[in-house]
């Protein structure tokens, strides 16, 4: 009989538990764990006996392999219900969705690998592939045959615990921002892909755990078909935070995709000035420059000094994609030139913007087709293009990444779908 220091959870599940006298305490139903120190550490056991569920902790518990038969032997049992725990393995993890942080995807837990570390049992890995499922249901030979037929290696897919994030919320006292801190380290586009694979409850929990900036960046990356359901489930506070960190051009795009309660919820949470600006953006026809322009840009007067400009930028703390170009305008907001951030930082602080600006600037009319903005961005290698009205007054900019995200990418996706 061999004592096991590493084993799979489903191998011990529903097995008899014996006390030191050889009597059966019951069958293992579930295991309580806490993640206070990282890896889920076993702190208690649910045992089923005669239709009743009992709760135990053991002074000593060992798992043995007796010629292929699993035995669980214990000493010093006491009935106790853990007051604080993070998960029940069967109820909250087994067969549930979990996020593979490295693979940046949602996977299903088919088994859990448990190891004895410093005298305590801990979950060290998640088994997520089909191999674990075949083995668990006792059809491993059938699985091997299938894999051989499709010429794939029959290998376990084990994800180490530090590389996964559970979606279950058991401890309601746990801060949401702490609960999903691994997910928050991912790129917004990867988080968006993960959210799209979750059900609405899980999606709401994860999204509300993100900080304000990350939530806004992630929301921008989410496919339009999911945005309405997210807005619908968000609290009023979180909705207001989200909108506050979104550009009005993005809000206008969002409103075009929403209707009914979801649309009203957005409008109610907008400040008056923002609502007016969004309404103005919504008037533009699709595929015109105005429909994808943003009103967030930096515009300063001809006589503002370099030193004053730098102080203004520090106070504004603008997004990096709008601070690269500073547009120089006259008293009537007509564009007279542009200052690149690099030139600003390398110039004498006492001179005016008019002395270092490039006055040969390319602009595009707000009613022009988006294709014209694309052409000018490519021809002059611009990160953003100034948008002017019929009086040549600066009213917005078109960012190159908005051209890609809101115009070129949807066209590419539509073409590939067909």
Where does each model-flagged region fall?
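Short beta-strand/strand-turn micro-motif
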Residues: 1-62, 88-131, 337
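Hydrophobic packing positions in regular secondary-structure scaffolds
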Residues: 66-70, 77-84, 88, 92-100, ...
């Amino acid at each position: 009989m061999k004592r096991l220091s590493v084993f799979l959870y489903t191998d011990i599940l529903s097995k008899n538990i014996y006390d030191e006298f050889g009597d059966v305490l019951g069958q293992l139903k579930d295991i309580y764990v806490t993640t206070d120190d990282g890896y889920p550490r076993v702190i208690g056991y649910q045992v089923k006996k005669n239709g009743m569920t009992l709760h135990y902790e053991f002074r000593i518990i060992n798992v043995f392999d007796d010629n292929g038969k699993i035995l669980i032997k214990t000493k010093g049992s006491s009935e106790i219900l853990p007051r604080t725990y993070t998960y029940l393995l069967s109820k909250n993890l087994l067969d549930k969705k979990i996020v593979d942080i490295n693979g940046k995807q949602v996977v299903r837990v088919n088994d859990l690998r448990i190891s004895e570390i410093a005298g305590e049992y801990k979950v060290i890995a998640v088994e997520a592939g089909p191999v674990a499922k075949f083995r668990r249901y006792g059809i491993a030979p059938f699985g091997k045959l299938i894999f051989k037929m499709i010429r794939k290696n029959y290998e376990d897919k084990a994800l180490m615990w530090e590389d996964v994030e559970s979606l279950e919320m058991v401890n309601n006292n746990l801060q949401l921002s702490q609960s999903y801190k691994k997910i928050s380290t991912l790129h917004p586009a990867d988080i968006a892909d993960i959210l799209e694979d979750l059900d609405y409850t899980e999606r709401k929990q994860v999204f509300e755990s993100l900080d304000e900036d990350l939530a806004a960046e992630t929301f921008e990356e989410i496919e339009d078909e999911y945005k309405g359901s997210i807005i619908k489930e968000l609290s009023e506070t979180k909705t207001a935070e989200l909108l506050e960190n979104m550009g009005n051009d993005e809000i206008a795009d969002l409103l075009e995709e929403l209707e009914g309660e979801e649309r009203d919820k957005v409008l109610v949470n907008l400040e008056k000035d923002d609502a007016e600006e969004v309404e103005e953006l919504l008037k533009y026809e699709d595929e015109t420059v105005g429909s994808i322009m943003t009103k967030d840009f930096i515009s300063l007067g001809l006589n503002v000094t370099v030193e004053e400009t730098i102080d203004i930028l520090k106070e504004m703390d603008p997004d990096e994609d709008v601070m690269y170009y500073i547009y120089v305008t006259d008293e009537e907001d007509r564009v007279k030139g542009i200052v690149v951030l690099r030139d600003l930082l390398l110039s004498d602080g006492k001179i005016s913007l008019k002395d270092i600006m490039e006055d040969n600037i390319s602009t595009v009319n707000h009613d022009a087709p988006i294709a014209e903005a694309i052409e000018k961005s490519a021809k002059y290698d611009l990160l953003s293009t100034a948008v002017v009205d019929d009086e040549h007054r600066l009213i917005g900019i078109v960012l190159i990444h908005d051209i890609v995200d809101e115009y070129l990418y949807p066209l590419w996706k539509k073409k590939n779908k067909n």
